[in-house]
Amino acid sequence: MKRGYGETWDPPPKPLPASRSGEGPSMADKKKADDDNNNSNMDDELLAVLGYKVRSSEMAEVAQKLEQLEMVLSNDDVGSTVLNDSVHYNPSDLSNWVESMLSELNNPASSDLDTTRSCVDRSEYDLRAIPGLSAFPKEEEVFDEEASSKRIRLGSWCESSDESTRSVVLVDSQETGVRLVHALVACAEAIHQENLNLADALVKRVGTLAGSQAGAMGKVATYFAQALARRIYRDYTAETDVCAAVNPSFEEVLEMHFYESCPYLKFAHFTANQAILEAVTTARRVHVIDLGLNQGMQWPALMQALALRPGGPPSFRLTGIGPPQTENSDSLQQLGWKLAQFAQNMGVEFEFKGLAAESLSDLEPEMFETRPESETLVVNSVFELHRLLARSGSIEKLLNTVKAIKPSIVTVVEQEANHNGIVFLDRFNEALHYYSSLFDSLEDSYSLPSQDRVMSEVYLGRQILNVVAAEGSDRVERHETAAQWRIRMKSAGFDPIHLGSSAFKQASMLLSLYATGDGYRVEENDGCLMIGWQTRPLITTSAWKLA
């Protein structure tokens, strides 16, 4: 008969044959015994981390009991009153669960007195029974004993037929989600402990569970499972990152879909632009250095705001940094030409210069051709600084360059997460919570076109792959929190600029216009503005000036 979750089980190993008189067991016999013990221990460990209270050596006995149970259930003489209201707890404890059902079915007379019987083992079947507590805060481990017990009801789900009564087991999606999360964390723990055999078995289990889990949880688990598999098999380098290898501009295309699908990038651009506008209120010439131009989506809105300024718009000079171009492409200049057309329509005097750089740490002050006597200088970075943390000294080199050109304001937008820790398991747990919130917010945007949603998920999935599977200089998605960036910026000689209540109110208004889900939140925290989903902040905008 079928086993739980479609798995099959081998009977316990047979005893070794007795050795001949005067002879000890052969080396082959010893090796076979060791292999059997190792396999048995491996199965026991896998069953434990997946929440089943049974050993592989007990599976033959459990299978025999299940066959007896099937024979009893197929008997039409079994009174329906025994089945209808029976409640059995803890099916993860296979042996006791089957034993309790057989015991009740073999004593149907007692059901007249109490139609609800239970076999309860509360110590092992809640979330604490499965390894991976680090995925859940300890203060949330409060359970109502009656409400939290998992039940399988027989009778109401069993339909009699002329042939036999068949039991249908319905798997609760919430319980599957819990098992999925715990299997993910258990796999990460196995990798952390360098138990790659167990990790390999668990990542396959995650793939099976993820395939049966609908919604955001199933999607994010699939990306994490792929990343864990790449780490287990050591199959990740910058060269094997398929999306980047196909075309460096592919990520820019993905980012455009992410921009359209949710308010995070809109919030980033809007709040940074608000800080810039307040810093250049009286300036007649504005020079913005964008450390990551991408598709230039941030700047039309700023030019439009400058065009509406009383007394006429200032001149606007934009220096955009981008990756090195291919031989037959000059996308930076093409983008500059499009922005120039837009500026002309707005009546804004515009000048553009594109700079190609392998790394932002390669930039030197003289490359920017600043005009301090006549221009107000602005430096802008959206999701760029964290990439420099992959190489020692790179972020310090860039910040020293920025400091040397003496900007009036530096605007910084970064992910509000700590994915730069040296301990893999901590980084994994943080990433699992962070990206689960992002995927959940995408799933809640019910009016989102399917193409935008899918491409946005790919955009985030690439980040998950890098955070989990990569190491060394290949791991560039090294996000840090606002508190961590505050320490870095202050040590480099910058002081924070408080983003005031006006920016907060306008950001909240923007959110009401563009956000399709009702779980988005804007908050002000220590002079920074944050956007998040439900109670979790996800993106932070901050502004800085020379100390």
From Swiss-Prot:
Q: Which domain of life is it from?
A: Eukaryota
**Keywords carried by this UniProt record:** Developmental protein, Differentiation, Flowering, Gibberellin signaling pathway, Nucleus, Phosphoprotein, Plant defense, Repressor, Transcription, Transcription regulation, Ubl conjugation
Is Cytoplasm among the key words of this record? no
What is the recorded phenotype of mutating residue 381 to D?
A: No effect on GA-mediated degradation
Question: Where do we find the motif VHIID here?
Answer: 286-290
Disordered: annotated span: 1-42
What does its record list under induction?
Up-regulated transiently following seed imbibition to decline rapidly as germination proceeds; this induction is delayed at supraoptimal temperature conditions (e.g. 34 degrees Celsius). Accumulates in seed coats of dormant seeds where germination does not occur after imbibition. Increased levels upon abscisic acid (ABA) treatment. Down-regulated by norflurazon (NF), an ABA biosynthesis inhibitor. Induced by stress such as glucose, salt or mannitol treatment. Upon seed imbibition, increased GA levels in the epidermis reduce DELLA proteins (e.g.
Ranges spanned by the short sequence motif VHYNP motif, renumbered to the chain: 87-91
Q: Where is this region: PFYRE?
A: 377-466
Query: What, per the annotation, is the impact of changing residue 411 to E?
Result: Resistant to GA-mediated degradation
According to the UniProt record, where is the region SAW? 469-545
Q: In which tissues is it expressed?
A: Predominantly expressed in germinating seeds, flowers and siliques. Only detectable in the inflorescence, with high levels in young flower buds and significant levels in siliques. In imbibed seeds, it is restricted to seed coats, elongating regions of pre-emergent and recently emerged radicles, endosperm (especially micropylar endosperm), and embryonic axis. Not expressed in leaves, bolting stems or roots.
Gene3D superfamilies reported for this sequence:
Transcriptional regulator DELLA, N-terminal domain
Please describe, based on the UniProt annotation, the reported consequence of changing residue 89 to F.
No effect on GA-mediated degradation
What effect is documented for mutating residue 319 to C? No effect on GA-mediated degradation
Task: Give residue numbers for sequence motif LXXLL motif.
Answer: 385-389
The record places domain GRAS at 171-545
Q: What does this protein do?
A: Probable transcriptional regulator that acts as a repressor of the gibberellin (GA) signaling pathway. No effect of the BOI proteins on its stability. Probably acts by participating in large multiprotein complexes that repress transcription of GA-inducible genes. Upon GA application, it is degraded by the proteasome, allowing the GA signaling pathway. Acts as a major GA-response repressor of seed germination, including seed thermoinhibition. Promotes the biosynthesis of abscisic acid (ABA), especially in seed coats to maintain seed dormancy. Delays flowering and adult leaf production.
The UniProt similarity line reads: Belongs to the GRAS family. DELLA subfamily.
Instruction: Describe its partners and assembly state.
Output: Interacts directly with the GID2/SLY1 component of the SCF(GID2) complex. Interacts (via N-terminus) with GID1A, GID1B and GID1C (via N-terminus). Binds to bHLH transcription factors such as PIF1, PIF4, PIF6 and SPT. Interacts with the BOI proteins BOI, BRG1, BRG2 and BRG3. Interacts with TCP14 and TCP15. Binds to and coactivates GAF1/IDD2 and ENY/IDD1. Binds to PDF2 and ATML1.
Protein name (database record):
DELLA protein RGL2
